[in-house]
Structures are given as structure tokens and as C-alpha cells.
Amino acid sequence: AKGLHYDIPIVPQSQYEVGLVTKSFSDSTITITVLNEYEQLQWCVLWQDTRATKSVEYNPSDDQAIISIEPAWRESKGRSFIRVYAHANGKQLNDLLIPMQDGKVVNDVAELTRFDDHAQILYSLMIDRFHNGNKNNDWKMNSPEVLDIVDYQGGDIAGITKKIKEGFFDELGITTIWISPITQNPWDAWGMYPFPNGNKYDSTKTYTKFSGYHGYWPIFTTEVEKRFTTEQELHDMLATAHKHSMNVILDYVANHMHINSPTLQAHPDWHTDSILPDGRRNFELWDEARLTTWFDVHIPTLDLERPEVCSPMTDSALVWLDKFAFDGFRHDACKHIPLNYWRELGAKMKQRYPDRHIWMIGETYGDPALIGSYVKTGMLNAQFDF
């Protein structure tokens, strides 16, 4: 019934176990095979995030569990989902997600669409390294300070469009393409520790500066990277993907900006301190200084706990949804961004796009509790857990 409280335990990854497999279904029941024998197996069954009123029929000596399909489930219209959780003896078994359409269990993959979030097959690509579809935007640095492997290679949005049209993704069964960031990055090279020998370049060494081919050093948060695309090429790629029944999600960087960005030039106090109170350098302290640490000297972490910083940065993210038909975001470095940012972004999205299907997927490395703290109503829909 609505409003009932239930607890789903969070356990270390080592205590997860594959133990549940769907076996069969009828109009009134779903049968699950339990792969091992468990004593005191505890169940939680949800339909549309509301707990089932009937208990799971399970005998530890049997290898099957029976879930009753309740009247409200059978009478529902459109897509709905049953979720099954189980744990026993300190182990959490794999959860099951069972889609329903108009009250009937979906058992044909052809019935799934790009709007079924949990059934997506994602293809992650780095734009610069994928395919070159427009040689007119190829601008390598060709600098003796930059090894070719970390220079721009020519991949672009036009190349993605070409591969969609050729059926590359269709043949793989891809339903969602996750593209690397497309915000404008610096034109010069960065990210190298000082040269030895009086700061002079030595061709016998393998050290190098880096281009921004990866896209994670935004100079502007609302302008496309000219080496990758024009706005029209981006519109064309999104339209082509949707024609092929594919989503496109954008990797978006909110945690930091390049030190030479006009934003930080105008607001030099908008970043966190690079020196800790005890005098240590605040770099790469991923857990100790999770919300303030810098990734590198040239990409300061934004102080997003401050409203005057958080508000315009959430607005910048929304520009990509206002101007382009993206299906969502893969958010970079989520655990280094405070919760107030996600709450504000989620609230603005709900107000601005009440009827639009938008993914919010995050990247967080850490324990299940930290990962799960961002997956809440009005924040992220899901996080990667690897």
C-alpha cells in the first residue's frame, strides 16, 4: 500500500550474489528460480515503487518463488515495472526488473523501446577518437611539446552521424549513444608537470603536454567545441539517432572549468582553495577533500556550495537541453559536486521540462552508500557502479 516503509540493505560489493532468475509467468503469477538454497530469505517486491501487498511464496527446500500479480498491476495502462529484491545471511542477491505493458509481462525484446531506461544498451565513445566525418574541422596542435597520441585525431560529430546512417550501431543492438563532452576546450596544450633541465624540451624524453581532445577542460560551458562540430551538425546527428530509435546522452562537466575560462577570469573567487588549512596542496585528494580537491592546477574545482556559483552553473547545463534534443546527461565526477547542485538542477529540469523524458546518469567511485546518496527523486536517476 502507498506509504508503507521498507528497507533495502546496502552491502559491500563482495557480498552481492547472483541468485535469482525469472523462469515463467502467467496472467496471475510470476515464477522465479532461486539458484541456491537460502535460509531466512527476505523479499521486497515493488510495483511502481509501491510495495506489494501479498507475500512471496517461497520454501527454502524448493528452487522456486512465486509472485502474485495483483489486480492493480493487471489493470494498469502503459509501461510499468515490478522490482524484486532479496537478501539472506548477509548477502544481497541480484535484483530483478520485470517490465509490464498494459498489465501484462513484457517477454519480447522487440517490445522494448529507447524510452525503457533499464533496458538500454549503451555505447560510450570519445568523439575525437571515433570517426572523422568532416576534415574541414581538423586542427591538430602539431607541437613538439605534444605527443601525437594525445593530440587531436579528427573524430567529430559528423563522423558519428555517418556511422549511424551506415548501421554501425544498429548491428550492435545499441539503443543509447553516450558521447564525450562537446564544450569548447582550450586551443593550447596543458596538463604537464614542469620540464626538467631548465624547462627546456628534450626530444629523447616521453613526457608531454596534452591537448583537450577528451573534452574535460571546458573554457565555455555553453559553446560547442569547434574541432568537433557546428550546432547544425549536432542537430543533424541527434535527429539521425532518434530516427534510428537511439538516445544520445551528453557527458557534461560541472565540477570544474579551465583556469583561463572567461567565467573564472571574471570571477576568480568562484573556485575552491587549492591549499588546505594545514598547508598541503589540495590536489587529487579524492576522498579526504572530496568536495574541494582539484583534479589539476589548470582546472580549478568550482565552489558549487555557494548559491552565486551554483545557480548560473545549473543554468549552463540546461542550455544543452534548451537548444538541442539530447535525451539526458552522463554527469562527470558526481561525488565531487555537492548535493545542493543536483537538487537545484533537478528542480529546474522538472519545472522547465515537465513532460520530457530526460536521463540523469552519474559517475561516482565509492561505496554503495555514497553512490546511492545521489540517486533520489529530483536528483540523479542512476549511477554507474564500476
Where are these regions (language model features)?
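Aromatic sugar-binding surface patches on proteins
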Residues: 59-68
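Active-site-proximal helices and loops of the catalytic beta/alpha 8
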Residues: 315-318, 322-386
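Active-site-adjacent "subsite" loops/lids of carbohydrate-active enzymes
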Residues: 268-324, 334
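Edge beta-strands of extracellular beta-sandwich domains
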Residues: 2-12, 92-100
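N-terminal structural segment of carbohydrate-active enzymes
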Residues: 69-227, 231-244
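Extracellular ectodomain segments of secreted/surface proteins
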Residues: 6-37
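Aromatic- and acidic-residue-enriched segments that line the glycan-binding/catalytic groove
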Residues: 139, 185-214, 254-289, 375-383
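Loop/turn elements at helix/coil->beta-strand transitions in domains of secreted/extracellular proteins
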Residues: 118-122, 170-177, 242-249, 324-329, ...
